[in-house]
A protein has these predicted regions:
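Active-site groove signature of glycoside hydrolases
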Residues: 127-157
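Active-site neighborhood of divalent metal-dependent phosphoester/pyrophosphate hydrolases
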Residues: 109-111, 147-148
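Charge-dense, low-complexity intrinsically disordered segments
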Residues: 67, 117, 155
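A generic secondary-structure signal
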Residues: 79, 129-133, 167
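A short, flexible beta-alpha/helix-coil linker loop
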Residues: 57-62, 117, 148-151
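Secreted/periplasmic carbohydrate-active enzymes, especially glycoside hydrolases
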Residues: 1-92, 97-102, 106-110, 125-126, ...
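Short, acidic/turn-prone active-site loops that include or flank metal/cofactor-
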Residues: 114-120
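Extracytoplasmic/secreted cell-surface and envelope-processing proteins
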Residues: 98-99, 119, 152-154
């Protein structure tokens, strides 16, 4: 199983053939684990209670801005693990695939946050692409649909989030959401 201490990963290879010839091939890395949230008892990973000790990670780094090299992504997760962290939130922006790859390899749970709270076609398309891209990452345990949005906490915002949650549930019913 994939865990914080032993982040076991596997690779599935999918090949598409036509007339007996390989026409396409793709490889997907994944981990196997169970996740449960209990209102009274907290977070459980593989049936064991885990206290999430995390940080909010912004997509920027001194000297390189938002274009963080893969090695620095991994270095940041390694340092967080060394500090005793086991979780992080990708603040205000979706994470890069390389960031999630590092979290998968190093055993760090992630709250994967979308860029904006929106039920317009563009916003829902962005959310769909995010979920489809990131749903095989065992590190991702929560989808964050909104943060510091002007519509949070009012009737219009509730309608927007309801639409977003319906799409999230259709694409990935295995994870919880937060707004």
């Amino acid at each position: 199983l994939w865990s914080l201490e032993e982040p076991n990963l596997y690779r599935a290879v999918t090949a598409l053939e036509a007339d007996g010839k390989a026409v396409d091939r793709d490889s997907t890395t994944f981990g196997i684990r169970t996740v449960r949230f209990d209102a009274d008892k907290g977070f459980f990973l593989n049936g064991k209670p885990v206290k999430i000790k995390g940080t909010c990670n912004h997509q920027d780094h001194a000297g390189v801005g938002a274009a963080i090299p893969d090695r620095i992504q991994a270095y940041r997760i390694e340092r967080l693990k060394w500090m005793g962290c086991n979780g992080c939130r990708t603040s205000h922006n979706p994470p890069t695939p390389e960031f999630l790859d590092a979290c998968d390899r190093l055993g760090m749970v992630v709250m994967d946050e979308t860029r904006m709270m929106s039920s317009c076609p563009e916003g829902l398309s962005e959310l769909e692409r995010l979920i489809k891209r990131d749903r095989n990452h065992p590190s991702v345990v929560i989808w964050s649909l909104a943060n510091e949005e002007p519509e949070q906490g009012n009737t219009r915002g509730a309608r927007i989030v309801s639409t977003m949650k319906k799409l999230q549930r259709k694409l990935d019913p295995s994870r919880v959401v937060t707004t």
